Amino acid sequence: MAFLKKSLFLVLFLGLVSLSICEQEKREEENQEEDEENEAASEEKRGLMSSIGKALGGLIVDVLKPKTPAS
């Protein structure tokens, strides 16, 4: 009977350890996916801000450019 108890405890312990490892790997994968999504969103924002900056810069240059009188 004691042998069966020890075997059962061993099986339960190994099952819990493997379950814990699987959950940890799953969390790591989810964190990697979130990081990739955040990185992609950050790149989109940088691209948008860059294009807006270029457009506004060109507009400001055109507005501040001295106008020559037409002859």
Curated annotation (Swiss-Prot):
Residues 26-46 are annotated as: Disordered. Residues 1-22 form the signal peptide. GO terms for cellular component: extracellular region; membrane; other organism cell membrane. It is found in: Secreted; Target cell membrane. It comes from the Eukaryota. Expressed by the skin dorsal glands. Keywords: Amphibian defense peptide, Antibiotic, Antimicrobial, Membrane, Secreted, Signal, Target cell membrane, Target membrane. InterPro entries: Frog_antimicrobial_propeptide, Frog_Litoria, FSAP. Residues 23-46 form a propeptide. Residues 30-41 have a biased composition (Acidic residues). Its main location: secreted. One of its GO terms (biological process) is defense response to bacterium. Belongs to the frog skin active peptide (FSAP) family. Aurein subfamily. Amphipathic alpha-helical antimicrobial peptide with moderate activity against Gram-positive bacteria (MIC=100 ug/mL against L.lactis and MIC=50 ug/mL against S.uberis). Has no activity against Gram-negative bacteria. This is Aurein-5.2.
